[in-house]
């Protein structure tokens, strides 16, 4: 669709809240409630943002946003390969993200944005949907499983 010039400037999809990856997300995270998972693409050849809004008071232990960040950072510090394909970025005051920043890479960035007053957070993953995509993630998962 992009090559044919038929893509909207920005488009969220899976708005039926039944994205095909939700069963895997539930399995891998141990969540008992389905998260609101809304991926989006735009009028650029490669790149995407995946957003997962969270109500912090509904999570076990009612964590703060900093706790989510620290848990993600600790997990990826243990499981990342030397290439550091997944990076958990520190909190920032810049509340905008460009979806195409990681074009032509196998990188994935995770960031937690939050409003502690309202006990809400959004976990955002930024990736090149073609560079990272299913095949890049599969290779990364195989390396993890094999201890490489």
Q: What kind of region is each of these model predictions?
A:
Residues 107-148:
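NAD(P)-dependent Rossmann-like dehydrogenase/reductase catalytic/cofactor-binding core
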Residues 1-123:
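C-terminal substrate-binding/catalytic lobe of Rossmann-fold NAD(P)-dependent oxidoreductases
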């Amino acid at each position: 669709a992009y090559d044919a010039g038929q893509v909207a400037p920005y488009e969220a999809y899976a708005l039926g809240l039944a994205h095909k990856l939700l069963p895997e997300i539930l399995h891998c995270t141990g969540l008992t409630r389905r998260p609101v998972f809304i991926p989006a693409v735009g009028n650029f050849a490669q790149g995407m943002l995946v957003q997962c809004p969270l109500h912090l008071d509904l999570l076990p232990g009612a964590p703060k946003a900093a706790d989510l960040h620290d848990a993600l950072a600790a997990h990826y510090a243990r499981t990342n390969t030397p290439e550091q394909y997944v990076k958990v970025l520190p909190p920032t005051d810049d509340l905008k993200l460009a979806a195409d920043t990681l074009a032509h890479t196998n990188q994935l960035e995770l960031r937690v944005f939050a409003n502690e007053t309202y006990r809400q957070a959004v976990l955002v993953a930024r990736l090149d949907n073609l560079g990272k995509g299913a095949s890049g993630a599969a290779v990364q998962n195989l390396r993890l499983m094999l201890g490489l």
